[in-house]
Swiss-Prot record:
GO annotation, biological process: tRNA N1-guanine methylation
Annotated keywords: Cytoplasm, Methyltransferase, S-adenosyl-L-methionine, Transferase, tRNA processing
Lineage top rank: taxon: Bacteria
Name of the protein: tRNA (guanine-N(1)-)-methyltransferase
The organism of origin for this protein: Corynebacterium glutamicum (strain ATCC 13032 / DSM 20300 / JCM 1318 / BCRC 11384 / CCUG 27702 / LMG 3730 / NBRC 12168 / NCIMB 10025 / NRRL B-2784 / 534)
Native organism taxonomy: Bacteria, Bacillati, Actinomycetota, Actinomycetes, Mycobacteriales
Function (record text): Specifically methylates guanosine-37 in various tRNAs.
Subunit structure of this chain's protein: Homodimer.
């Protein structure tokens, strides 16, 4: 049985509006490319300049009130989002960069557990994600929720961003989320799209194959993931922890939990919620006093 014969019926459509369509080529590679090939994922990339007018196909103009930089024009973005929401355009449909069908991962052979689509009140509207430093921080919880979506549209801003009226008006046709991937500024939204798309798509049943691969990820249980090891047993004088060879699954699980707790305490202590920890967890962290 191939992985594609064992999949849930859920499919995701991604549409990306950008002035640099070639920037999205990485979506054709690796596991996302395989998801496209397996029919789990569809990706359409739309050049914003197709909606621009005039000889220069300008998509930006000077900001009202003065100040540096340029602002992306509403009369270009508005029609673009209208058409994408209505399915009136067919951008460059991305295909897989290389064939993957004969390269089934060993952890896909065990099958994929199905997951129901999460129904929301406004589920008939596509989800519009606008990457911006001013947006709400993107989290693993967002990725998990959005992996249940059927249609996500990304609006990639550049320069000083998109005229705010575009975002406000889009709420008539979309569920709009302005989202940030970190407290720093990028040149444009395309990099953020690659980050969000990969985080979301990998959670769709059939993409990773082994459901435990993402259940044990960092942040999936509120903690950072602990260290991982593979062959050889000793490398450059460094040994793999003995507990991993014990064959005692309970001890291995406890060790991994302890490592996740200690790593989180050292690197991201703000993620630890003592109210969610049991007595053993608290003892590991020295919080049982």
């Amino acid at each position: 049985m191939t992985s594609s014969e064992n999949l849930d019926s859920h499919r995701l459509r991604l549409d990306v509006v950008t002035i640099f369509p070639e920037y999205l080529d990485p979506l054709r590679h690796a596991l996302l490319g395989k998801a496209i090939e397996d029919g789990i994922l569809e990706v359409g990339v739309h050049d914003l300049r197709n909606w621009a007018t005039g000889g220069h196909k300008a998509v930006d103009d000077t900001p009202y009130g003065g100040g540096p930089g340029m602002v992306m024009k509403p009369e270009v973005w508005g029609p673009a989002l209208d058409d994408v929401a209505a399915g009136r355009v067919s951008g460059a449909e991305l295909d897989s960069a290389s064939l993957h069908l004969k390269n089934v991962r060993h952890d896909e052979l065990g099958g994929v557990e199905k997951r129901a689509y999460v129904v929301e009140e406004d589920r008939d509207l596509p989800l519009l994600l606008v990457p911006t430093p001013a947006g709400k921080p993107f989290t693993q919880a967002d990725a998990q929720a959005w992996s249940n979506e059927e249609h996500i549209v990304f609006a990639c801003g550049r320069y000083e961003g998109i005229d705010q009226r575009v975002i406000d008006d889009a709420a008539n046709r979309y569920r709009v989320r302005e989202v940030s991937i970190g407290d720093y500024v990028l040149i444009g939204g395309e990099v953020a799209v690659l980050v969000i798309a990969e985080a979301v798509v990998r959670l769709i049943p059939g993409v990773l194959g082994n459901r435990r691969s993402h259940e044990e990820d960092s942040f999936s249980d509120g903690l950072l993931e602990g260290p991982s090891y593979t062959k050889p047993r000793t490398w450059r004088g460094l040994d793999v922890p003995e507990v991993l060879f014990s064959g005692n699954h309970a001890k291995v699980d406890r060790w991994r939990r302890d490592q996740a707790l200690l790593r989180t305490q050292a690197i991201r202590p703000e993620l630890i919620d003592a109210s969610l920890l049991d007595s053993t967890d608290l003892k590991v962290l020295g919080l049982d006093k």
